């Protein structure tokens, strides 16, 4: 009986530790990544907000949120993207 109680205790501790570790990794996983960029400039008045992709993504990107709720990936090295980001930061 003591062996099964000890085994159960070890099993419960292992499960608790695994759940804690997986929760930590889940918090760091990127939610959105860009795999391609929009090919042309979109009108600035369509943009409501933006966020940058996580560093774990394969490509860097800026994701613009449009006023209609769409997400659009843009190349952060493009001049117009940098201007939109700067303007959004100033208006925040």
Swiss-Prot record:
Keywords: Chemotaxis, Cytokine, Disulfide bond, Inflammatory response, Secreted, Signal. GO terms for biological process: antimicrobial humoral immune response mediated by antimicrobial peptide; astrocyte cell migration; calcium ion transport; calcium-mediated signaling; cell activation; cell chemotaxis; cell-cell signaling; chemokine-mediated signaling pathway. The keyword Heme does not apply. Residues 1-26 form the signal peptide. The record marks 40, 68, 70 as: Involved in GAG binding. GO terms for molecular function: CCR chemokine receptor binding; chemoattractant activity; chemokine activity; kinase activity; phospholipase activator activity; protein kinase activity. Disulfide bonds join 33-57, 34-73. Its main location: secreted. It is found in: Secreted. It holds the Pfam family IL8. InterPro entries: Chemokine_b/g/d, Chemokine_CC_CS, Chemokine_IL8-like_dom, Interleukin_8-like_sf. GO terms for cellular component: cytoplasm; cytosol; extracellular space. Belongs to the intercrine beta (chemokine CC) family. Self-associates. Also heterodimer of MIP-1-alpha(4-69) and MIP-1-beta(3-69). Interacts with CCR1. Monokine with inflammatory and chemokinetic properties. Binds to CCR1, CCR4 and CCR5. One of the major HIV-suppressive factors produced by CD8+ T-cells. Recombinant MIP-1-alpha induces a dose-dependent inhibition of different strains of HIV-1, HIV-2, and simian immunodeficiency virus (SIV). This is C-C motif chemokine 3. It comes from Macaca mulatta (Rhesus macaque).
């Amino acid at each position: 009986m003591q062996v099964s109680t000890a085994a159960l205790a070890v099993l419960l501790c292992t499960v608790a530790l695994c759940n804690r570790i997986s929760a930590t990794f889940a918090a760091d996983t990127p939610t959105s990544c860009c795999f391609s960029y929009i090919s042309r400039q979109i009108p600035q008045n369509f943009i409501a907000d933006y966020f940058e992709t996580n560093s774990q993504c394969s490509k860097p990107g800026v994701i613009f949120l449009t006023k209609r709720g769409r997400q659009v990936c843009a190349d952060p090295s493009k001049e117009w993207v940098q201007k939109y980001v700067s303007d959004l930061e100033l208006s925040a």
